[in-house]
Regions:
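Transmembrane alpha-helices and adjacent helix-loop boundaries
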Residues: 1-133
């Protein structure tokens, strides 16, 4: 067995151990960041003055700080919880800010006539968002 064969075996073993954890991390972060983005983006598109400013600050801060710094901050400050869930929390918060801006942009791109049509039909806000927008 050559050195190259040993290296290939070691790399395959490491990939076999790390790949399931990576896929779990991706799935959990995607789920939570989508949830954060949809909820906060919908709230932000309603343009409630104080809430809009707070969420705008959240978006600016989370998009301005590198993800690795957020990971290190949460890892150093949160002593309870596993490394996996600390990683999920920090990545989801950062990516949730990006998703929030995407959802907000989607709401703002809807034509004003569609909002007025829903208002003329006297649809509740949730029905307007689900069925019209």
């Amino acid at each position: 067995m050559t050195m190259q064969d040993r290296y290939i075996i070691v790399v395959k073993t490491m990939l076999g151990q790390g790949m399931p954890m990576t896929l779990k991390l991706i799935g959990a972060c995607l789920l939570f960041s989508l949830l954060i983005g949809i909820v906060f983006g919908t709230i932000r598109s309603l343009k409630i003055p104080v809430v809009d400013q707070i969420l705008g600050l959240y978006a600016v801060v989370c998009r301005g700080i590198p993800t690795i710094i957020v990971l290190l901050f949460f890892y150093a400050t949160l002593v309870r919880g596993t490394q996996f869930w600390i990683s999920v929390l920090s990545i989801s918060l950062v990516e949730g800010a990006y998703m929030m801006e995407i959802v907000k942009g989607g709401f703002l791109s809807v034509d004003k006539g569609q909002w007025e049509a829903a208002k003329a039909l006297n649809l509740p806000l949730i029905h307007t968002i689900v069925y019209i927008v």
